[in-house]
Amino acid sequence: MTRRAVRHCEHFSLCVNVGKKGHVIAEDPRERFTIYQYNIYGGGKAGVMFEEGYIESQVGVLMDLRPHVHKKVIFEATEDFFTIGFNTLDKNQNWEGRLVKKNETKLDLNYIRELEKETFLICFDGKPVVNNKQMKRYDYARINLSKDYDIKLNNGALGLFFKN
């Protein structure tokens, strides 16, 4: 059994899957909008139907799934899992994403500032502090590119995403 939840924003959505070892999920490209994935714990193997090879999920890593958004994908849990997906609302809209680095005490926005793109910070885990405000899992904030942001990860995980 898997529990699923979705949190919508006007620019993207977050989907959450929590399940047990052995569970199988099949996603049709008409329903698949996940372009990045972060595993809190556990995981499994995912592959594109009728293609060789698979991707093995990794805990604490932001996985880039953009190449698979238009494909039929099957996932089998090799252990109990808790996964958060970053979803585009428009498959023709590209997003770039990365995790904030453990040693990043000021949010590095130099490249994004040059591009002047809409940017969001998302809390995947823990209780990081951004400009003296504590975030919790699933919180997100639009980044004002004219400001600087002080970061204390506190063993948490923050994702930085911008439309490209």
Task: Enumerate the language-model features and the residues they cover.
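Jelly-roll (double-stranded beta-helix
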Residues: 1-164
